Amino acid sequence: MPIGVPRVPFRSPGEEDASWVDIYNRLYRERLLFLGQEVDSEISNQLISLMVYLSIEEENKDLYLFINSPGGWVIPGIAIYDTMQFVQPDVQTVCMGLAASMGSFLLAGGEITKRLAFPHARVMIHQPASSFYEAQTGEFILEAEELLKMRETITRVYVQRTGKPLWVISEDMERDVFMSAAEAQAHGIVDLVAVE
């Protein structure tokens, strides 16, 4: 039986009585953002709008992006990444559970020195994929070219964010590479592993 999104009491400054708001709304007010699903256009737009709004509201207070995501679409993910780099506040990233594919890309996109993984978290990187089997031959070639450009972009970002050489990242992206939190730290995707 679904219970829906939990609601918690929240009292706005100057109000006597607390009102009940969904837990995510309450946490957003504390600058805590969550990516707990596959990246798509809808969640991308929601996270981008929250980051922009919160950065306008208070530009010197860090944002926290908690990630437990199997990955998702490339373009919406890159849009989130670009916004993280654009907004004035630092965006601290926290991996809890799994940060795979686009999730690991966003994890690496946090402010360097402020990227954290929980001790039992898993991180996975690989190359972007597409649904070639649905395309006609001409579309297939155009899509393959675009996919190659996306792979180059993602590879360059990983190189910049991790400090690893291009050949290491390129080789890792050839297949699914799963890492523990400590391995992700050694790989430069996160800076710290939380202590149990």
From Swiss-Prot:
SUPFAM superfamilies associated with the record: ClpP/crotonase (SSF52096)
Entry keyword set: Chloroplast, Hydrolase, Plastid, Protease, Serine protease
Listed GO CC annotations: chloroplast stroma; endopeptidase Clp complex
Signal peptide coordinates: none
Cited InterPro entries: ClpP, ClpP/crotonase-like_dom_sf, ClpP/TepA, ClpP_His_AS, ClpP_Ser_AS
Catalytic activity: Hydrolysis of proteins to small peptides in the presence of ATP and magnesium. alpha-casein is the usual test substrate. In the absence of ATP, only oligopeptides shorter than five residues are hydrolyzed (such as succinyl-Leu-Tyr-|-NHMec, and Leu-Tyr-Leu-|-Tyr-Trp, in which cleavage of the -Tyr-|-Leu- and -Tyr-|-Trp bonds also occurs)
Family assignment from sequence similarity: Belongs to the peptidase S14 family.
Subunit-structure text: Component of the chloroplastic Clp protease core complex.
Identification of the protein by name: ATP-dependent Clp protease proteolytic subunit
